[in-house]
Amino acid sequence: MFSRLSRSHSKALPIALGTVAIAAATAFYFANRNQHSFVFNESNKVFKGDDKWIDLPISKIEEESHDTRRFTFKLPTEDSEMGLVLASALFAKFVTPKGSNVVRPYTPVSDLSQKGHFQLVVKHYEGGKMTSHLFGLKPNDTVSFKGPIMKWKWQPNQFKSITLLGAGTGINPLYQLAHHIVENPNDKTKVNLLYGNKTPQDILLRKELDALKEKYPDKFNVTYFVDDKQDDQDFDGEIGFISKDFIQEHVPGPKESTHLFVCGPPPFMNAYSGEKKSPKDQGELIGILNNLGYSKDQVFKF
């Protein structure tokens, strides 16, 4: 699985990266905020799983791509840690001029044990309330956070291998998972990432992903898929979508000790696994993974 993959020439299927319909998640949070699986941590952790919002300042804003930025947030002290575990996320909040709360979940891309600060990679969506707000901020402005929220409780060596299927900013939770698995010398799980974007320039966290592949060639592999490589003659990936045939050829089958994690915009989710019904309900498994014979219990939707 980790040998050089043969190039496919599938007909390009554009990976829609339009506005993600996440307003329902906000309503769900406020209706069920006492039911989330919060993670409790020691006193040196900033986020303790309680109901307290913490205002944190932006220390740096960097351009990740033409429509995506990396925000670095400063923790209260240089020795502070987030308090997240694998795999978990945070809620971010701002209050509109009319007094309405806008809340969205975000997965930090920093090392979970990073001290003093953490980073979010955020894509700007046209009409997106939170992303428009964040893109209007500057260093020293603050954002309210709370959490952490457990998404999937990872247990080392639970599976022989896992496959991550992602598109766009869906890479964030997948990268968190991959990074911490391969960096753990006691976790022998092999990680295979299939990551789709419109162009090579849209590939997020590419530097970090390529570094993992170079450092841990026996544990981690990534294959990039783009609709159009444009003028990038150095692009060493696949042109087209992540096809059923490609998955069948390069991903461990449903009878093996494996698990699949999927994250991306709604069209991507519907094509491969179907969307979650809510943050607490994974919904039915449909799409390509269902057609390949994987069961609902073998696929997790971030």
UniProtKB/Swiss-Prot annotation:
Origin: domain of life: Eukaryota
Keyword Flavoprotein: yes
Induction remark: By osmotic stress.
SUPFAM superfamilies assigned to the protein according to its UniProt record, in alphabetical order: Ferredoxin reductase-like, C-terminal NADP-linked domain, Riboflavin synthase domain-like
Family per similarity comment: Belongs to the flavoprotein pyridine nucleotide cytochrome reductase family.
E.C. number: 1.6.2.2
PTMs per UniProt: There are two isoforms of NADH-cytochrome b5 reductase, a 34 kDa form (p34) and a 32 kDa form (p32). The p34 form becomes firmly anchored to the outer mitochondrial membrane after an incomplete translocation arrest. The p32 form is formed after translocation of the p34 precursor to the inner mitochondrial membrane, where it is processed by mitochondrial inner membrane peptidase (IMP) complex and released to the intermembrane space.
Lineage: Eukaryota, Fungi, Dikarya, Ascomycota, Saccharomycotina
The protein's required cofactors: FAD
Chain positions listed as propeptide in the UniProt record: 1-41
Pfam family, one: FAD_binding_6
Domain FAD-binding FR-type: 51-155
Alphabetically ordered keywords of this record: FAD, Flavoprotein, Membrane, Mitochondrion, Mitochondrion outer membrane, NAD, Oxidoreductase, Phosphoprotein, Transmembrane, Transmembrane helix
Reactions listed under catalytic activity: 2 Fe(III)-[cytochrome b5] + NADH = 2 Fe(II)-[cytochrome b5] + NAD(+) + H(+)
Purpose: The outer membrane form may mediate the reduction of outer membrane cytochrome b5, and the soluble inter-membrane space form may transfer electrons from external NADH to cytochrome c, thereby mediating an antimycin-insensitive, energy-coupled oxidation of external NADH by yeast mitochondria. Involved in the reduction of D-erythroascorbyl free radicals.
Residues holding FAD: 158-193
Full protein name: NADH-cytochrome b5 reductase 2
Site keyed Cleavage: positions: 41-42
Modification Phosphoserine, positions: 278
InterPro entries, A to Z: CBR-like, Cbr1-like_FAD-bd_dom, FAD-bd_FR_type, Flavoprot_Pyr_Nucl_cyt_Rdtase, FNR_nucleotide-bd, OxRdtase_FAD/NAD-bd, Riboflavin_synthase-like_b-brl
GO CC annotations on file: mitochondrial intermembrane space; mitochondrial outer membrane
